[in-house]
Amino acid sequence: MSNNQILFERAQKTIPGGVNSPVRAFRSVGGTPRFVARAQGPYFWDADGKQYIDYIGSWGPMIVGHVHPEVLSAVQNVLADGFSFGAPTEAEIEIAEEICKLVPSIEQVRMVSSGTEATMSALRLARGFTGRSRIVKFEGCYHGHADSLLVKAGSGLLTFGNPTSAGVPADIAKHTTVLEYNNVAALEEAFGAFGDEIAAVIVEPVAGNMNLVRGTPEFLNALRALCTKHGAVLIFDEVMCGFRVALGGAQTYYGIAADLTCLGKVIGGGMPAAAFGGRRDIMAHLAPLGGVYQAGTLSGNPIAVAAGLKTLQLIQAPGFYDALTAQTKRLADGLAAEARAAGVPFAADSIGAMFGLYFAERVPGSFAEVTKSNVERFNRFFHLMLDEGVYFAPSAYEAGFVSSTHDDAVIDATLAAARRAFAALAA
């Protein structure tokens, strides 16, 4: 029995499912999860000592690679000063100033400890600001596990939303309307029917939890125009795509300003940190200035802030995003070429340092299209690549991530492994 198997059996005795986040359990792909012992650059090593090329990167934060020496030094420099204070620090101001500088639509920002806290707080703030209750979200977009966001579409446009998780009261779910991603007609119909009831529309401008699906410019511009017309707050959930698709996130990529923005992952540099921010007049409704309560014991934790601030400084290096985008595109295009050569139906896409792999004829534009992918074939491909020492997301419905340490040799090794994997699939 491998060390990974031993650890997984042991973990299941004291941790539900043996993991602290469901996707890690390998339920989608089958087999035994890899327990990570250490990581460096684009690699990690599991409990059996096997090395893997890592295309998850802690689900996005590790944009400069694992244990970057400057990030490590920044963390080490603050450790001796104290782990947490429950009081303001100068470093909190510095990271807030950096975020406001990099994301033009953010005039003020508040730190929290997780992406779920960021989206949950942004929605509460939007409701407090507008005095309305209804939220609009989109099928396939993931915004954390707050009750009001674990909702799927009802049977028709005006039907109340239905909870997607046990433990979510129907009375909460009914305030959330779920529409199809990238469907402008459905969006216009919804605003025509109840636009003046909508407190906020929350969207991933580049979705990463139904695999990678880009928001179309037409869709995102329609969102901006309709929210402005009806006085609804437009919330861009950039927890995943923020500082991933461009230095200023999806908003600078598309040239669209949100009213509120949720950030995470990269801004913590691998530590638990997230944030939400936006227009000053909206943020002024937060306590202690306004009546919308939000708080957190570890918000602005000095260790997380040190890691995040150094990461934000590193990604501003000249040419950083040009090189990262080119390398990610090389990976995606190379995988598609290898599949084509083997005669395996497959498509790939990339934007910035995010990529998507689809066992389908074309790149999907909605959740319904994503679900038509051949999941069984993906699962086989995942395990073939895992055996080759390449670690993709253990689910057909997750995006992948490239770091600045994924150099030509790493990409070449990945494509060589993929060539063998696609050949096995085609056999």
UniProtKB/Swiss-Prot annotation:
The organism's taxonomy opens as: Bacteria, Pseudomonadati, Pseudomonadota, Betaproteobacteria, Burkholderiales
Task: Share what the entry says about its subunit structure, partners included.
Answer: Homodimer.
Any Pfam family the entry gives:
Aminotran_3
PTM sites of type N6-(pyridoxal phosphate)lysine:
265
This protein is called what?
Glutamate-1-semialdehyde 2,1-aminomutase
User: Which keywords, in A-to-Z order, does the entry hold?
Assistant: Cytoplasm, Isomerase, Porphyrin biosynthesis, Pyridoxal phosphate
List the catalytic activities from the record: (S)-4-amino-5-oxopentanoate = 5-aminolevulinate
What is a single molecular function from GO for this protein?
glutamate-1-semialdehyde 2,1-aminomutase activity
Instruction: Choose any GO biological process term that the UniProt entry carries and state it.
Output: protoporphyrinogen IX biosynthetic process
Pathway stated in the Swiss-Prot or TrEMBL entry: Porphyrin-containing compound metabolism; protoporphyrin-IX biosynthesis; 5-aminolevulinate from L-glutamyl-tRNA(Glu): step 2/2
